[in-house]
Amino acid sequence: MNLLPKTREEFAQTDYWNEFFKKRGEKAFEWYGEYLDLCDHIHKYIKPVDKILMLGCGNSKLSMDMYDSEYRDITNIDISPVAVKKMLEQNARTRPDMKFLQMDATAMTFPDESFSVALDKGTLDALFVDDAPETKAVVENYFKEILRTMRNGGRYFCVSLLQEHILNFLVEFLPRHNCMLRIVHCLGVEQANKEKNADDAMKMPVFVVIATKFKSLPMPILEFGLGNDKMQRFTESSELSNAVRSVQKAALVFNGLARSSIAGHDEVTLDLYRPSENTPRYSIYILDQAAARGLNKYAAFIVPQGREIEWLFGTPSGRKKLQASAKFQRLAVVTLHRDQVYNTLEEVQAELGDTVFSLAPHGHIKQIPYLSLGSDVGKRETLISGFSKISGEFRIEEVEAGGKTLRRLIFLSNQFVVQSEALVKTIKIKGKKERKKIDFGYLACQHHLYMSVGVQLATTLQNPKKDVQKDVLVIGLGGGGLCSFLHAALPQSRITAVEIDPIMLEVAEQYFELKQDKRFHVVIDDGLAFVERCRNEDIHFDAVLFDVDSKDLSLGMSCPPQGFLAHDVLLHIKEIIGPKGLFMLNLVCRDETLKTEAIANLQKVFPAVCSYKLEEDINEVVYCANDEKYKTVEHWQKAMGTAGRGLNTTIKEHKLASEDPLEVAEFLSELKL
């Protein structure tokens, strides 16, 4: 494994440790591995010429196996005379040069700098049973003796489970005593434990601690490895501790998922990082559903690049639907992150292999199937990276999805939400180079289609004079997709878009082919200030649309910002649209209390309010009118039915689509007061 797992869930680690040791008793120390499991690390850090001190040998075979592998200068000590006598009898003939001495490791009688390696397999964990002051005093004596008897440049090599109090002590004590400290996740031991304890779903990560003694160190040297040769270097001890804890927390997730199903509960999320990187390379969402006839056991689903923002892959409810259609009791949904390079699907599977295996239900030994939408990892190309003073960092990306090329505006502050999306078509002209063109008939956001029905109603049915252009105000431009669509589909409309961020106008013009003309212009201004000015100057619009998001992601309402629903703002809108106009807003609200409050505020100002809730999104399009004839849902349905059919017709007439984009009957059936 070369990926560091970090879970987003919290667990009571102390309880888990207690259960681990209670369950195993004396057998807990079998968990530290044998020579074959540790030999890669031993050979890397200990040489046959080293003078080795084995601390607390007990009845371990480790020193015997090392002796048989040409490590001949080994001195074993143990506080138990029974253990020492037994080991002497066992090794006197076959390993005559190996020494066994009864000695307390906290008060050794060896001269200073006698050894080049001090080897500890579980002895520290046996000594350091709790964080009591008297225990800590014993451990400090233990380390002082180790460092006293160790030569400069010598190594303390320790196999440990690194309980929290042990880890905290090591990262503080050893650097303070001029030791370079390296901690390596020992995957070989874990794999062996899985094989030897196949019936035991409870697993704990094992670590090798390597502390190298120096005369002096001007600054701490702290490193962490995931079992490969690549080390991550830190400047702060807390960073090293956090790396270890990330592996331990992930193990708790793996153990919990191995031991029980989470069917009926929320999904569990895991992020995977490369060493030395602060942004995740993969995110994994683990879902369970109850066992049933026809369901297979376990699979992983790899979402191609750029598709992770789609409802099916980017939301908990979408992923549940994906699991149901895939027909697996457990599904691990893997998403790939931007600013990472992924070559082939096979390479991604290989990189994920250890983690995906660790997430399997207990006892699952079959090969794990990998599912995806195709045979590759998808394509994501960044066209530009930019910065907005209002919205922060943003990207313009092109992704391949379902045989289409989509151009997207993404704000990195909320990068799983697409701010704007356009369909890119390739135009072939005989004798000329192919060029890309934005398809203005493509509406990525479904709520834009339902807002457009309202615009059709306000500009044709409410004001039927064909020779008079109808004025439409859109607050919030983004990439300009909605405005470009309205401009192309409704030639009798005259559109004013208000955008607070001047960078967004540049983006819309340069990357989404937004074009201003006599029927469409953009005003750079604060939307609320513009609305107030229109009211004060007696400027009217046939339709007003709020399609603006909140920059405060902590609030339960994402669209619009709460200030846009203030009573005085709504009164301004009421005057601006006049007796025949229509006000529409995109309401995105996860908090039911806030949502109810928002609708109530609208109903206080407008005599007629109705809404349409999108099926797969949390978006709800709310329509508000001053015309009291719309007080019943039947009147809304009649007017919206005519407007919807008219919108379908004009879209096809202007060659923006070949088929009706709006399912009129379904739309009308879901309209609610």
Swiss-Prot record:
It catalyses: L-lysyl-[protein] + S-adenosyl-L-methionine = N(6)-methyl-L-lysyl-[protein] + S-adenosyl-L-homocysteine + H(+); N(6)-methyl-L-lysyl-[protein] + S-adenosyl-L-methionine = N(6),N(6)-dimethyl-L-lysyl-[protein] + S-adenosyl-L-homocysteine + H(+); N-terminal glycyl-L-lysyl-L-glutamyl-[protein] + 3 S-adenosyl-L-methionine = N-terminal N,N,N-trimethyl-glycyl-L-lysyl-L-glutamyl-[protein] + 3 S-adenosyl-L-homocysteine + 3 H(+). It is an enzyme of class 2 (transferase). Coiled coil: none annotated. One of its GO terms (molecular function) is protein-lysine N-methyltransferase activity. It comes from the Eukaryota. Dual methyltransferase. It catalyzes N-terminal methylation of target proteins via its C-terminus. It catalyzes dimethylation on lysine residues of target proteins via its N-terminus. Pfam families: Methyltransf_31, Spermine_synth. This is eEF1A lysine and N-terminal methyltransferase homolog. Belongs to the methyltransferase superfamily. One of its GO terms (biological process) is methylation. Keywords: Methyltransferase, Multifunctional enzyme, Transferase. Signal peptide: none annotated. SUPFAM superfamilies: S-adenosyl-L-methionine-dependent methyltransferases. CDD domains: AdoMet_MTases. InterPro entries: Lys/N-term_MeTrsfase_sf, Methyltranfer_dom, SAM-dependent_MTases_sf. Its EC number is 2.1.1.-.
